[in-house]
Amino acid sequence: MEEASLCLGVSSAEPEAEPHLSGPVLNGQYAMSQKLHQITSQLSHAFPELHPRPNPEEKPPASLEEKAHVPMSGQPMGSQMALLANQLGREVDTSLNGRVDLQQFLNGQNLGIMSQMSDIEDDARKNRKYPCPLCGKRFRFNSILSLHMRTHTGEKPFKCPYCDHRAAQKGNLKIHLRTHKLGNLGKGRGRVREENRLLHELEERAILRDKQLKGSLLQPRPDLKPPPHAQQAPLAACTLALQANHSVPDVAHPVPSPKPASVQEDAVAPAAGFRCTFCKGKFKKREELDRHIRILHKPYKCTLCDFAASQEEELISHVEKAHITAESAQGQGPNGGGEQSANEFRCEVCGQVFSQAWFLKGHMRKHKDSFEHCCQICGRRFKEPWFLKNHMKVHLNKLSVKNKSPSDPEVPVPMGGMSQEAHANLYSRYLSCLQSGFMTPDKAGLSEPSQLYGKGELPMKEKEALGKLLSPISSMAHGVPEGDKHSLLGCLNLVPPLKSSCIERLQAAAKAAEMDPVNSYQAWQLMARGMAMEHGFLSKEHPLQRNHEDTLANAGVLFDKEKREYVLVGADGSKQKMPADLVHSTKVGSQRDLPSKLDPLESSRDFLSHGLNQTLEYNLQGPGNMKEKPTECPDCGRVFRTYHQVVVHSRVHKRDRKGEEDGLHVGLDERRGSGSDQESQSVSRSTTPGSSNVTEESGVGGGLSQTGSAQEDSPHPSSPSSSDIGEEAGRSAGVQQPALLRDRSLGSAMKDCPYCGKTFRTSHHLKVHLRIHTGEKPYKCPHCDYAGTQSASLKYHLERHHRERQNGAGPLSGQPPNQDHKDEMSSKASLFIRPDILRGAFKGLPGIDFRGGPASQQWTSGVLSSGDHSGQATGMSSEVPSDALKGTDLPSKSTHFSEIGRAYQSIVSNGVNFQGSLQAFMDSFVLSSLKKEKDMKDKALADPPSMKVHGVDGGEEKPSGKSSQRKSEKSQYEPLDLSVRPDAASLPGSSVTVQDSIAWHGCLFCAFTTSSMELMALHLQANHLGKAKRKDNTIGVTVNCKDQAREASKMALLPSLQSNKDLGLSNMISSLDSASEKMAQGQLKETLGEQKSGAWTGHVDPAFCNFPSDFYKQFGVYPGMVGSGASSSCPNKEPDGKAHSEEDVPILIPETTSKNTTDDLSDIASSEDMDSSKGENNDEEDVETEPEMMTKPLSALSKDSSSDGGDSLQPTGTSQPVQGLVSPLSQAPEKQWHSQGLLQAQDPLAGLPKPERGPQSLDKPMNMLSVLRAYSSDGLAAFNGLASSTANSGCIKRPDLCGK
């Protein structure tokens, strides 16, 4: 009973069957009560509506199963049938008297119910398609039927490795294996053995620990032996462990003893001994370590192999996987014999044996190499048949094998003594000759291919063999005379096979299509030319066959847009209509091209020239290049590693190409990218993916030539001046091209990306798109490391991240300059570049001056007059020492030129594209300056009161004419602002700190901090400027001249308030330097001695040092720091020239009156210098207090007094360089230009006496308008002469603008 339950998969611990199930047997199988019980339960489950509905008041009757569990053998048969009839709703005939024919009862009374059950069985029968031939039982799957058949045949292929038990299913045998463990270890005796084993293990571990301890303290003696029980304990433990794990119920199967120790040789122990990987114990011999591991760490050893495990479950799973599978092939019949079945199906991969073939078939799916379905064309194998079916569609679609013959049926035409096939077979005939090894008529050229195929000496792949077959062509083509080259076969000296089956032709075509890119390209070109040539043999004009060949040999293919058809154009200019099939073949032949990635093969590709009568030469480097070549897409040329990827990729090209029929096919070689010269027979395309030669499916037959690829580099990709391939190919073939084709642009062609297959209208868009694949990013940000593929990306980046740094100048660094101004500006833009780029390069060159360098002469020669040149020659940099003023400027020029060269080298070493950035910037700067000049003129004309500046004795008339002329010249050649300024200038009364590329403005009077310059200006006006205004109102001293001048300056500067504050501030400071410098030039000889002596007499009013306003001390704005010539702007207001009281701002009166000076905006600039020296300390080395530095010319404001807090000021004769915001390098070009208008201002005011120079005072405090005016970008116009407003709050006269 136990064994039967094991076979059925039932545990032996099941209780015995109920007594009523072992009653009288009906028909030798089941008891009657059991049969009734089964039928009733089936009917109740199938038809639940037959159950009686219990009343809620009454107790529900007992269920059928509860009644069935009553011992029915004690009840009469009539009561059982009545119970069944009550369930079925039928009355039982009492005449049966307990003897009932069950079949008659069911057939007669329940015919309707059984018919419904039969319908359900019919539905189940349809789903179960596999019936058992012996018992009729049906199964859904054949595998379940095969397992069921073992119950009839008695086959039990799974044998227990420890006993003679066999099982028909593997799961049953696994259950049986558990009985070995449970039957032995679950009893009490097994538990005792397990406890003894653990005890021995602990003793063994203690002994090993003592032995290690003694070995470390004392030297082990050879005669010392362990106690007898110490040696026997491990062996006993080993034996007990083995018996406990692998004991068998039958004595006839003893447990095999482990291998004797004498089998293993004693290994030479190293100095450290053998260490256990589990417990890190050391042993002298390998045997001791193995025994230790087997007893303590892996006590569960398999008796069938050398496997050992640390847990019992691991050992059981090992037996199930290893030993049951090995024994599963031994079939056993009903007689219990152990003979092996003759019908074996063994797996060739893993060796597993199966009893049925379909088992093996299902098992082979587990292995990766089980590709059973093979393609007869290309030999590719698939796992599933539908994969092969889809694969065959690829062959039919890609190869386009269509039986399109001419109007007449097959006509045999003699060619070389061989009968020809139909036009439909032309496609594969030339590929078959590729496959057959290019059979020559005399079989002489078959030496290498025949050896390759016949003897098989070279272990090459079939693709490499086909590639090597192409090598004899070049040698054959040279030996053929010209008379035999009227056809393609004559040119190749080949004879194709006469007949071939369809499958062979498909195989040849597929192999050619799957060749590596070089050989595949050759095969497709060979086929396309063959179709064009063979069309002559299949045409109607058979008597004129030879003439037709000659015509085709020198013919080109054109597309007539008026007639919308293709025509053949001969060498004499005659046109002939081209049939549709030949047009199709031309397209097929022209759709093959080489990828631009295969650089090693670029120099070795020599193909057909432009004419069809040229020789065919294939110059390959050798078979070594054919190995491991990727596969190329025939449509777009994209390269893939496997052919399967090409098939998947080909779905992209299945959509219809619009405009393909509207294009122009010029020549059959056009797609190979041939050049315009006859000598160039190479098709080596540009290795740059952005070149125009990568356009594949353009519809016009190709991309540009090598000579025409320059079109892609121009900003106008559709320029008609660019040469295209069709025109060049037509010229080389001797065909006169129509004017319509010459004038056409490539914009109508469809350009395809060779990487992703996207289509573009122009080559320019394709070139921009290709940068995504190539990683090219030509548009680089001048402020950071960002680079973009398109100009729009860089524009967005600059707008997003560097808006405050952009000074409104220049295009992007990667943009090509405008073509209209390239020639004009090429000779005038040599050393100008963006100031932020020059900032890092020219920092640290304190002595450089662009005016002394030869490079600046390019500007002065075209702009300045001879008088200006002489005036400029006398002008020196403010950094030149006083002793250098007496000499010439030639040594200074050479010095500056060397420093400019050094700065240029530093720029080039930093990766700055000097010429490109220079040209692009200057082109845009000229246009912006012209536009700005026009706007300034309109604003100046609209504001007449600001234009009037009163002079003395009509002295303003003479400079006005020259200034207007000079202003027009300056507008065309406006110099670049090279002033070096910090990233974010500070407002007067605030400091700037840069954190995380953000400029933070901090108020000097309180703890207010903001990143917005406008908010800081509002804060200063609301909280701090109002106090100064109230304090100033208490004094109550005003001057009408200054009030009117300040109102005029407000009106002049009100339209010019813009957000670009850095540029305006730097230009104002530069103009301050230039004005002071020109004053120094006129006063040099008079004041040199006085400056050296350090005398203050005649320069500064004594009251100048007593400055009462604390507010202006905070800002460092000293209102008295205005130049001479102030009285000339207000002659009517201050005729006596008396000075004001001490409450007013003191007067600065220099010795001479040869120059005018700046207004109170220069005071604001000086306050900027003070703030920058306080907050940033950028140029501390420029603050000099040595006495000899007092001899420098008047060029800038002093920084010593401003850094001291404003208690005292140096005189204007002791000028120091303004280094807070402007470096000497940036000042130099500004001085050269801003001083042009000031050079003419010497004579009108030269004769004025000193008392006529009215004093200047600045009583009004700084308001919001003056703060924003200091940062206005259009403030540059007033100082450069681009506007006609005075913009002076101190009534300072600008002689170059007075006449406007």
From Swiss-Prot:
GO MF annotations in UniProt: DNA-binding transcription factor activity, RNA polymerase II-specific; DNA-binding transcription repressor activity, RNA polymerase II-specific; retinoic acid-responsive element binding; RNA polymerase II cis-regulatory region sequence-specific DNA binding; zinc ion binding
SUPFAM superfamilies attached to this UniProt entry: beta-beta-alpha zinc fingers
Polar residues: bias regions: 675-696, 856-880
Residues that bear Phosphoserine: S826, S827
ZnF C2H2-type: positions: 130-152, 158-180, 274-297, 300-323, 345-367, 373-395, 631-653, 751-773, 779-801
Location (main, coarse): nucleus
Keywords assigned by UniProt, alphabetized: DNA-binding, Metal-binding, Nucleus, Phosphoprotein, Repeat, Transcription, Transcription regulation, Zinc, Zinc-finger
Cellular compartment(s): Nucleus
Compositionally biased tracts (Basic and acidic residues): 48-69, 594-604, 657-674, 950-972, 1133-1143
One Gene Ontology biological process: regulation of DNA-templated transcription
Entry keyword annotation includes Repeat: yes
Biased composition (Acidic residues): 1160-1170, 1178-1187
SMART domains: ZnF_C2H2
Family (UniProt): Belongs to the krueppel C2H2-type zinc-finger protein family.
Function field: Transcriptional repressor that negatively regulates neuron differentiation by repressing retinoic acid-induced gene transcription. Binds and interrupts RARA from binding to retinoic acid response elements (RARE) composed of tandem 5'-AGGTCA-3' sites known as DR1-DR5. Recognizes and binds 2 copies of the core DNA sequence 5'-CCCCCA-3'.
Protein name, as recorded: Zinc finger protein 536
Taxonomy of the source species: Eukaryota, Metazoa, Chordata, Craniata, Vertebrata
